Amino acid sequence: TYDAELDQLYIGTGNGSPWNRKIRSPEGGDNLFLSSIVALDPDDGTYLWHYQDSPGETWDFNSNMDIVLADLEIDGEVRNVILHAPKNGFFYVLDRTNGEFISAEAFAEVTWASHVDPETGRPVEVPGARYEDGEAFVESFSLLENIVRERFRTPAETEHYSVVEVIRYRDG
């Protein structure tokens, strides 16, 4: 998505391969830039900032869904924001000037993480969520089904107005 107001280009990225992080990155880590929004200078490609919504992604939760630009009043101040609902089941609001995490709320039943920590902007994974750590996480299939049903039945262009209303009501 190109932001003419800020002259920034936002790119949603995919997941890594192989999906199993223990094979892809045996030493662990976030696998930076997987399942992220990366902001670049469109003139020369200079990296500006990124936000990773699924650190160490291992469930095919890519982040290349619609990136909606909006100006929202948050805590009495109008902020330039990104509205984004990737495959991990959370709806994100980010400051598009610098990638600062503002909020995230589940838009479908999420079984791999309990919530997104408001201080760090990182999902709080539930025990056993990573299939490479033990038995298969059967609920992840339920999660994917819920996300596909809730997220992909209509394009964001027709949904974002109701989502903005939800944000407005939550923020007062």
In which residue ranges do the predicted regions lie?
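Beta-sheet-rich non-transmembrane sensory/scaffold domains
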Residues: 1-172
